[in-house]
Amino acid sequence: MKIAISYPPIVNQEGQKAMVSQNRNVQFFKKPTYLLPVIHAQAATWLRDLGYDVLWDDGNSQEKNFDDWYKDLIAWEPDVVVLESTTPVMKFYWSLIDRIKSHIPKSIIVMTGYHSMRKPEETLLESSTDVVLKSNHIDFVLKKLIPYIDEHENWRSNCPIEGLTIRRDEKEFYDTGNFRQIESLDLSPDVDRSLVNWKNYAYENGNFLQTPGAYATSVIRDCMFGKCTFCRYNGPDLTFSMRSVNKSLDEYQRLIEENGTKEIFDDSGVWYRGAEARAFARGIIDRGLHKKGCYFGFNTRFGYLDEETVSLLSRANFRFILVGLEACDQETLDRLDKGYSVEDAEKNLRLFSKYRLYPHLTIMVGYYWQTRQQLEKTISTVRQFMFSGLARTLQVTLCTPLDFTPYHRECI
């Protein structure tokens, strides 16, 4: 059975490529930027380990244009095509799915992603999609679904795997119930870096000061906080799962010693905190990985790391600390349910800077309530943080309503 895990090149009128994976807020990049879809890469590895013929088909990182990517996919004639999408590009995907079905009608199309998982019937009605995964645990579900399809001709009628909406025919859909919210992440394999052509992601990424870099297998799936109104990792249908410290340390050691990786970034919604964060830093030091010329980085929240932890992280050669500032007026922070103030942010930035970490600020603009005065306050405060040395780098994006988050529903 042949399975393609596919990411088509999506280019807008300005020549910018859409990145639909590993993002809390969809982005279009003019400068080449290739982000490894970690959970889908774990799924690809798991299916390959089960004996399936897996094609890692990321047209973006392979620098293909759309026509070449599409031609190659159709020529391979996969039995299953797994796609991932998000709100701003759903119509593109619906059209693409119908086109794929017109050329390889027997292929089973599986849609993943936070937009379709929250409204699966929409994607089934708007396209020829066969299955919508309602789970964020793509790897765990595909590991069960693909063998079931392979072994049961009537899989559409009686599939017992939870967290799916399945097309029985043109108008009838079959829902298998809620997905399992918490999984034991240690059961999912580390990403096979050769399978996903890891070097395609190792250089063109602004998060890396040194290359080759790599995204680690995430230690937290989704987010421990899970309340920010704009973020897809939000809602009563989601919680978080955690990977063990030792399993993650083993992967870091392999990435450094076998792949020669010079920077490792963990793109978990929010990385470890407290005891796990300190244990991880001590593990890096105990294994001598902090002396291998490799930097480490992760996402966190203001207020999640105390001074003892930050000190240990600094000793362990952590560098890049990505934190979501989002805005610098309290009304916006409260409406986004961020759970901190600008004063809290400044206090944390001073702590990071004291221990020579490199805070990277993420800011968004374009909130539907945002006034010029609020925007100017954000600009002036961020300028102060940057020019006083409290932050090293920053990125600014438009706040895009997506994936039926609370912010998206407010905008609707």
Specify the residue positions occupied by each region the protein language model found:
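Radical SAM [4Fe-4S] cluster-binding motif and immediate context
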Residues: D186, V191-P359, V365-Y367, S380
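Glycine-rich beta-alpha loop elements in corrinoid/cobalamin-binding modules
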Residues: I39, W46-L47, Y52-R180, F404
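Flexible glycine/acidic-rich beta-alpha junction loops that bind and position SAM and/or redox cofactors
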Residues: N12-Q16, G274-A275, E331, R335, ...
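Hydrophobic/aromatic residues located in beta-strands of well-ordered beta-sheets
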Residues: I3, V54, I109, I161, ...
